[in-house]
Amino acid sequence: TSKAKEIMKIIKTEGIILKKKEINEADVIITIFTKNFGKIDSIIHGIRKSKRREKNVINPMNVSEISMYQKNSYYTIKDMELKKTFLEISKDIEKLEVGFYFLDTINKIYEYNDVDEEFYDRIVNIFDYLDRKEITNSAEKYIMVTHFLRRIMIEQGIYEESDIMTYFSKDLLEIYKLI
């Protein structure tokens, strides 16, 4: 029937993997912050046993192109293609700590299906910046985290950007603009 086809329509989006959870021998549930649907949970069947699929496509912090279908309130991934991975972050424990903190914060603060394309683009840019940035001391790491949290507070309407700008020196303001 046409109603059944409508339910199983393939939808495509881009998303950054927030976390993954293995649910049985072969399947994984992943939480994704997507560009077009906000935060969603989706199941990907058979990925852990597949010899054809790239298993790293579901690793947290990776940006992927996702083809999926929605049935009721559940998403099932049909196909994923790795679009971007942040290699320099994965090689540096300090960057990994910051990156996973960012992912966890996004996961805890953003509600399911809360679409924010502008914030999604900003998140990808933040990870690009973290990937390029050399962290030379702990203070830099904490400054980045503080700026990120302030950015989230602005996005969530807790602070106005003009209020936050008064707290920064010129040097810190440059970092803040990137994050």
Where are the model-predicted features located?
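Non-catalytic alpha-helical scaffolds and adjoining flexible linkers that form interface surfaces
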Residues: M8-V28, F33-G38, S42-I179
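Short, Lys/Arg-enriched N-terminal segments with co-localized hydrophobic residues
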Residues: T1-I7
